[in-house]
Amino acid sequence: MAPLRPFFILALVAWVSLADQESCKGRCTQGFMASKKCQCDELCTYYQSCCADYMEQCKPQVTRGDVFTMPEDDYWSYDYVEEPKNNTNTGVQPENTSPPGDLNPRTDGTLKPTAFLDPEEQPSTPAPKVEQQEEILRPDTTDQGTPEFPEEELCSGKPFDAFTDLKNGSLFAFRGQYCYELDETAVRPGYPKLIQDVWGIEGPIDAAFTRINCQGKTYLFKGSQYWRFEDGVLDPGYPRNISEGFSGIPDNVDAAFALPAHRYSGRERVYFFKGKQYWEYEFQQQPSQEECEGSSLSAVFEHFALLQRDSWENIFELLFWGRSSDGAREPQFISRNWHGVPGKVDAAMAGRIYVTGSLSHSAQAKKQKSKRRSRKRYRSRRGRGHRRSQSSNSRRSSRSIWFSLFSSEESGLGTYNNYDYDMDWLVPATCEPIQSVYFFSGDKYYRVNLRTRRVDSVNPPYPRSIAQYWLGCPTSEK
């Protein structure tokens, strides 16, 4: 029997090898499975964890994700006399409105280390009179003990301090003591609100950014400190000194924006701006997919990760990969590496990734022209606590609502939408993703192509009016 022992050993090794070669057969809609050695969920391409037969079994298409075709500030037509979206009111509106996305409401009106992103909910004990609450929220109050703030005028043209996307896709702008939430066309009802009521920090702040990973934590900077939030809740141990968390980054920064890692093995970056210089900082690690299970996935990150399915690896590496620096690099001059951007900026924000290309006339004919502004925000398709999987039919129907046909801003093509149309067609080979960065200075802003690091040459040219293109304010032109 001794001569047979090697055969048994070889057979055992072969069986173990086959067991390691897990398949995606029957798993394409089951989501992430921590117990498996390889994955078949829609994010496995980004995490480089797909099973060997993922492409064959699951047949992923980049068109099943949210695909934007134009940058945030482009219109179907440049109609400067369009009616504003009721944003001519210049006073603060302390009315009761629903919080955006899955942000948690505050239960205490006082400032505590843990801050929530909804100041509207009343304290449970004892409830004050409505008149008293209005006096607290109204910025022009003169009651003793209540700070006085100047009345905020939406279309005043004053510079903004910060812009950032939250993990649920909401876009927030900060100016002075106040913050705004922006929707697809203008400012959401109920804004502006005091930053202290919404974030638990007394404004003004210096800068803000949200990391583009599965957790999507938001960072606010003020003076020598910074605050970190997850799902609207301040993380324990914050605020912290900038020198502790971001070694090499100066205090009192002017602006900041974050970029994703080109893949899970890469590193996220954030750019800080102060005066005429900027600093590039690299995070040393990002959370794993398993660490993010059980919580809501960042919609901004999901949009980026789904684009990894297509053959754009080289472009993403060019955009988001850099040599390792272990923290902050030496400061550089803005004018040297960001061509066309003013020497000093007030705020900055990374725009959404959009895809340019062209369509045949027959494909365009199936769509109806839309005059809606193209600043559609990210839409999360997963709720907190729900398993991250859907059937192929439900996935297709839910995502098609937010899907746009490919177009080119340079060629003047607009965005077409039809919510009942089946979107299972392939991306044209000529399409490629473009990442924009927005720089805000005074009452104007600039859009920069991250790949060329130059201000986009479009019509109307940059700089453009922040009030008109981002706030929905009426134009002075007739």
UniProtKB/Swiss-Prot annotation:
**Keywords annotated in UniProt:** Cell adhesion, Disulfide bond, Glycoprotein, Heparin-binding, Phosphoprotein, Repeat, Secreted, Signal, Sulfation
Q: Which residues form a coiled coil?
A: none
Listed GO biological process terms: cell adhesion mediated by integrin; cell migration; cell-matrix adhesion; endodermal cell differentiation; extracellular matrix organization; immune response; integrin-mediated signaling pathway; liver regeneration
**UniProt region (Heparin-binding), positions on chain:** 366-399
Pfam families, per the entry:
Hemopexin, Somatomedin_B
Skewed-composition ranges (Basic residues): 364-389
The residues that carry sugar chains are 86, 168, 241
Sulfotyrosine carried by residues: 75, 78, 80, 278, 281, 416, 419, 421
* Tissue expression profile of the protein: Plasma.
Q: Transmembrane residues, as ranges? A: none
SUBUNIT field: Interacts with SERPINE1/PAI1, insulin and C1QBP.
The protein's job, in short, is: Vitronectin is a cell adhesion and spreading factor found in serum and tissues. Vitronectin interact with glycosaminoglycans and proteoglycans. Is recognized by certain members of the integrin family and serves as a cell-to-substrate adhesion molecule. Inhibitor of the membrane-damaging effect of the terminal cytolytic complement pathway.
Q: What is this protein called?
A: Vitronectin
The organism is Mus musculus (Mouse)
